[in-house]
Regions:
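Glycine-rich flavin
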Residues: 2-4, 20-27, 32-173, 204-208, ...
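N-terminal Rossmann-like FAD-binding beta1-loop-alpha1 element of flavoenzymes
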Residues: 5-30, 185-192
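Short hydrophobic core segments
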Residues: 7-9, 114, 133-143, 178, ...
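Glycine-rich dinucleotide-binding loop and its adjacent helix/turn
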Residues: 46, 142-196, 201, 229-230, ...
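A Rossmann-like FAD-binding core segment of flavoenzymes
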Residues: 73, 108-111, 115-127, 194-292
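Structured beta-strand/loop patches that form or line metal/cofactor-binding pockets in enzymes
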Residues: 352-375
Length: 375
């Protein structure tokens, strides 16, 4: 049995930053990650989508160059295989950077799936492969997984999630995106700029439900001018090889023929097979319950990142990991706060927010002022 001060399960933004932080504060750290270091953000989310988006935005700027006094001659042709290859190179470079950071910090990295397996006195046991590790503290940072909704026929078609969309080396002939949140709308922008016909189906009255309603509506209209078709307050009732069957808000049913379906209805905390039951760690709808110091119902087990279900953003995860390590080492009183977390949709144009939206303040009956600056 190997001994460490802290075991961190998960090598995403919460995990790897917390590992380096803990090591710099004198703790002996072991980090477990069964796939690539960097988590969803680096491998299947923030970084690859923004890399593709940069190519798409650059293409838009070239097309608009004449308005800025620049003549571009000849055909303007995106080569998606080359765009995807650049994306892969960026991800590989940054993943290597995470490994280098952890090695430099003296963190022991184990490429295995790990789970909680019990206690011995004041030590927590973590099992990975054939090995068991004895530690004083654990930080759970296993992230989240894509929600697959129970849509009839879904198991009989070759649908994509963001993972498959990012792994593709060719563009789809057309795409129907189920879900109008940040991930879905970012893909809508990428595909429309690259010439792919796009539909977006959203159950809510507006896209980007967590953002300011007026801003979201303005973005939807801009994307509409670019050819993206939106179906709001619309439910997907079935999918097949022929396409997507929808039910509109007035009860009408319609088949939308499509070549590719992209599911983007959200993510859920990844807690399965983690062994939470061995230490009676409390959960709420699969999210690990924590206090303001990221401490779970077990005093020596902490959690950070998407697994807590609060704010599925990389910078939130990093801060949560920081709060957890600070509490473990007995640092200054510095609890986690969620009232001023910035969020961004990397659309074209980008939109961002911080704090409560106007809709939230209105629903809570709180006083607020709105200021608008035409640009």
């Amino acid at each position: 049995m190997k001994n460490f001060d802290i075991a961190i399960i998960g090598g995403g933004p919460a995990g790897y930053n917390a590992a380096a932080n803990a090591s710099s504060n004198g703790l002996q750290v072991v980090l477990f990650e069964h796939t690539a270091l960097g988590g969803v953000c680096l491998n299947e989310g923030c970084i690859p989508t923004k890399t593709l988006l940069h190519s798409a935005n650059l293409l838009d700027e070239i097309r608009e160059a004449k308005a800025f006094g620049i003549e571009v001659e000849g055909a303007i042709t995106p080569h998606y295989a080359a765009i995807a290859a650049r994306k892969d190179k960026v991800v590989q470079t940054l993943t290597s950077g995470v490994a280098y950071k952890l090695k430099g910090a003296g963190v022991t990295v184990i490429q295995e799936t790990a789970r909680l397996s019990g206690e011995e006195g004041d030590r927590i046991l973590v099992t990975a492969g054939e090995e068991t590790y004895s530690v004083s503290f654990v930080l759970l940072a296993t992230g989240s997984s894509t929600i697959i909704p129970p849509i009839p026929g879904l198991d009989k078609v070759n649908y994509w999630t963001s993972r498959e969309a990012l792994a593709a080396k060719t563009l789809p002939e057309d795409v129907t995106i189920i879900g109008g949140g940040v991930i879905g709308i970012e893909f809508a922008g990428i595909y429309s700029s690259l010439g792919v016909p796009v539909r977006v189906i959203e159950m809510a009255p507006e896209i980007l439900g967590a953002m300011d309603r007026e801003t979201s509506a303005m973005l939807r209209k801009e994307y509409g001018r670019r050819g993206v078709k939106f179906y709001l307050e619309t439910k997907v009732t079935a999918v097949s090889e022929e396409g997507v069957t929808i039910e509109t808000k007035d009860g009408k049913s319609e088949l939308l023929p499509t070549r590719q379906i992209l599911l983007s209805v959200g993510r859920r905390p990844e807690t399965e097979a983690l062994g939470l039951e061995t230490l009676s760690i409390a959960t709420n709808r699969s999210a690990v319950v924590v206090n303001a110091y990221m401490q779970t119902s077990h005093p020596r087990v902490y959690a950070a990142g998407d697994i807590t279900g609060f704010s599925l953003l990389a910078h939130t995860a990093i801060r949560e990991g920081e709060v957890a390590i600070n509490h473990i080492i007995g640092g200054e009183d510095d609890p986690m706060r969620y009232d001023a977390i910035p969020s961004v949709a990397y659309t074209h144009p980008e939109i961002a927010g911080v704090g409560a939206t106007e809709e939230q303040l209105r629903s809570e009956g709180r006083y607020y002022r709105t200021l608008k600056l035409p640009m």
